[in-house]
Amino acid sequence: MRKYEVMYIIRPNIDEESKKAVIERFNNVLTSNGAEITGTKDWGKRRLAYEINDFRDGFYQIVNVQSDAAAVQEFDRLAKISDDIIRHIVVKEEE
C-alpha cells in the first residue's frame, strides 16, 4: 500500500449541502475500493490562479490516503467525468 495525496477543486456555485455530498461521495469511492483515509483538509473557497470552465474561485479539498493503485485510479476516473469537480490531481508521496 502506498501513500497518496489527492487534491480536488469543487465548483464555487454549489450549495453547502451538495458540497458535503460530493466530498462524502468521493471519500466513499476511495474507501469502498480498499483505501484508508489518513487525513482530510478543507481549504475552503480560494481564488484560482487562472479561470477554469468560466470559474474564478473554487472549494479546495485535500485528502491523504493509503491505498493501492486501483482505488486511486477509480477516483481519477470518476473525478474526470464529474461536473462538480473542476480540477483534481493525485500525487504519490515518497516513502
From Swiss-Prot:
Induction record: Strongly expressed during exponential growth, decreases 2-4-fold in stationary phase, part of the rpsF-ssbA-rpsR operon. The operon is induced by DNA damage by mitomycin C.
Keywords: Ribonucleoprotein, Ribosomal protein, RNA-binding, rRNA-binding
One GO MF term attached to the UniProt entry: structural constituent of ribosome
GO biological process: translation
Gene3D superfamilies to which the protein is assigned, alphabetical: 3.30.70.60
A GO CC term assigned to this protein in UniProt: cytoplasm
Pfam families the record matches: Ribosomal_S6
Cited SUPFAM superfamilies: Ribosomal protein S6
Described purpose of this protein according to its UniProt entry: Binds together with bS18 to 16S ribosomal RNA.
Protein family according to the UniProt entry: Belongs to the bacterial ribosomal protein bS6 family.
Record's subunit section: Part of the 30S ribosomal subunit.
Protein's recorded name: Small ribosomal subunit protein bS6
